Structure formats: structure tokens, C-alpha cells
Amino acid sequence: MAMPDVSLRQLLEAGVHFGHNTRRWNPRMAPFLFGVRNQVHIIDLQQTVPMLERALREIRNVTAGGGRVLFVGTKRAAAEHVAYAAKRCGQYYVNHRWLGGMLTNWKTITNSIRKLRQMEETLAGDGQGLTKKEMLNLMRERDKLDRALGGIKEMGGLPDILFIIDTNKEKLAVEEANKLGIPVVAVLDSNSNPEGVTYPIPGNDDAIRAITLYCDLVANAVLDGISAEMAASGADIGALEELPAEAVDEDAEAHA
């Protein structure tokens, strides 16, 4: 598996160049804007291509070194695609709501994950000793915790890099990563604030096709990094590729 190529045509077809109405913009994004068309800011894709490639290389390098990638996108347009991409490459995600302290108070989050596991074990054992009402309440509580923490349940520690869709909505995630010195890769629309983003990717962060493209490219970069790590350790790359293929099939069925 090779690093994914990024072409200008790919980005154009996905609508990556369309920013927001000129009334809704952040002046800090001015260096990344090409101009205005029909009162809509147009993002300079000549800059996006190399910046996207740089971000993908960094993600690839992180996973080649055995690092963890956390995908973050909680708005409706991104949530499903973020989860699907993270699962496809064996990484982690937050797609429901960013809980305060998710990174900076990891110990408390770990306790909540432990609580989630205990609930799952109880329910897997048919909830012996519980009344029907207690079972229903436990299931509701489990579902609520799983929506918030299910995507990081297996992470086992802090991530080594974040990939974020919409930094305006995920401002808290950026701030927490900055406090801990965790690098941030993020898509920045014309109304975004680039502050605190280590590897910015100027582009539309609302269009489904654009979001899907970013997520696919990042997932492929992760898989390329994992392949490189396995090759360096002398592991069987064929075995590595077989496992994700099965996982992809399962996810694709659920995604359909």
C-alpha cells in the first residue's frame, strides 16, 4: 500500500474549494483564500494540495512509529464518516460530543470507560439479579456512555495526533490537544480559526463529498503507516492486509 495521491481534480470534484458566504469568514484565513465568486469565498487549492499532502505524511509517520490517531467530528455531516474511516484503519474516534477533559482529564475518562465495560459485561450476562426496569435503565445508561466513549474505548492512552473536521465546533478538542502538546491536523474552512492547528488543511468542512474524501485519505495514510511499521518489524504484511479487508467488509455492510 502506498501513500494516497492527492490531485487538484479530486479536490475540485469534491467541492473542497467552496468556502462560506463572505459575511461569514475569519480574516485569519485570508492567506488561504483565492478570491470571491457569487459572494462565496473560494479556497486556494494550489495551497491545499501540498498542505494536505504534508498532513497525510505526518499521520503516516505517526502510525509508522506505532502511534494512535484520534478522528474528531461531531457535527451531523461528519459523524458517520469519521467513525467509518477510523474503524476502517483500526483507529479511534469521537463523533457524538466532545466531553470536557477528554484528553486533559484522561484518568476520569478511563474510569468512565471502565464503567462502560462493566455495564457491557453485566448486560452480556443477561443482567442476572436485575429487574426488567433495572435492565432497561442500565441499557439506556450503557447506550449513552457508548455514544460518548465507544470510539475511544480501546485507545488505551492518549492519542499521538488528532484529525479534526470543523475546528469551530471542536474548539475544545484543539485547546486540550494544545495543552498537552499533541499535534492537530484539521480541515479549515473560510470561517475557521487556524490558531492551534499544527497541520492545517484549507478546505470546505461541510460538504459530504469533501468530508468523505478527507476521511478516506487519512484512513489510507494510517494504513500505509501501519504497513510500514509491520514491514520494519519483519511481520507478515499479507496477514495485516487480510484483517482490515474483513473489517472493511463488515463496516461496509453496516454502512450501506
UniProtKB/Swiss-Prot annotation:
InterPro entries: Ribosomal_uS2 (IPR001865), Ribosomal_uS2_bac/mit/plastid (IPR005706), Ribosomal_uS2_CS (IPR018130), Ribosomal_uS2_flav_dom_sf (IPR023591). GO terms for cellular component: cytosolic small ribosomal subunit. Keywords: Ribonucleoprotein, Ribosomal protein. GO terms for molecular function: structural constituent of ribosome. PROSITE patterns: RIBOSOMAL_S2_1 (PS00962), RIBOSOMAL_S2_2 (PS00963). Pfam families: Ribosomal_S2. Coiled coil: none annotated. The keyword Ribosomal protein applies. PANTHER family: 30S RIBOSOMAL PROTEIN S2 PROKARYOTIC AND ORGANELLAR (PTHR12534), SMALL RIBOSOMAL SUBUNIT PROTEIN US2M (PTHR12534:SF0). Belongs to the universal ribosomal protein uS2 family. This is Small ribosomal subunit protein uS2. It comes from Acidiphilium cryptum (strain JF-5). The lineage of its organism: Bacteria, Pseudomonadati, Pseudomonadota, Alphaproteobacteria, Acetobacterales. The gene is rpsB.
